[in-house]
Amino acid sequence: YLGWIFQGPLWSKGGAYSDEWDLKFTDDKTIKAVEWLKDITDEKNGYSYVGNDMAMEFGTGRAAATVLSTGDLAGLTDTAKFELGTAFLPNPTGEGACPTGGAGLAIPAGISKNRQLAAIKLIDFITNEENTCYWSQNVGYMPVRSTAVDNEDQKKFMKDNPNFETAIKQLPETRPQDNARVFLPGADQEIGGAFEKIVTNRDDVTKVLTDLQKTLQSIYDNQVKTVINK
């Protein structure tokens, strides 16, 4: 999910994937930020790299630091052979440089009432306070409901395991992801694939981002615009 990982650094350098539905892949600041990504991942002169499994790379000591989902935290805590620490993502502009993440649970309007009732019961079970605390403590994701954060067992767990509290403390500094990544069908794969061409194949940044903008603009025009304008 390189498209998600790079959203924060991109913001911190003044770039963006989009402003609402206005795509920004070919804006000067976006191009400059992606040029920076290409530079720091240069095999000879860079100081970073992109791997297939950065949790494993970091957990085995091949990488000194990494940016990951909190969903990797519990596994790394159990397997890392060194003292593990977590920290806020850099926010040099003060405008937020950590994107929100995760997924959601929804009930389709077009299914039967019985299935809708079954779905809401399942969602209630998955997200109730007790199960939210269990899930958070055993995976690493931050609790998905505020009552779980205030749960006494959860409070004790986070006091004993402060790495699990970092994301909660950082939440006021987060920003919703740009529309271009989260609302355009297939956009995450397109963005990640474009970055892989740049980082791995060392392709020209401007050309790759121009092609990406054309692809995602077509997706918006043909699949999204007609729906949101109804």
Language-model segments: what does each one mean?
Residues 64-69, 85-87:
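Paired acidic/hydrophobic, glycine-rich loop segments that form the ligand-binding mouth/hinge
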Residues 35, 42-45, 77-142, 176, ...:
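Extracytoplasmic/periplasmic substrate-recognition and gating elements
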Residues 47-60:
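Short helix-initiation/N-cap motifs at beta->coil->alpha
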Residues 87, 137-197, 222-230:
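Long, aromatic- and glycine/proline-rich binding clefts that accommodate carbohydrate-like moieties
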Residues 20-48:
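Glycine-centered hinge/linker elements that transmit conformational signals in sensory
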Residues 197-210:
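Short, charged, surface-exposed loops that flank catalytic or proteolytic processing sites
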Residues 1-22, 29, 63:
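Extracytoplasmic/periplasmic solute-binding protein
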Residues 51, 68-73, 103, 168:
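Beta->alpha turn/N-cap motifs
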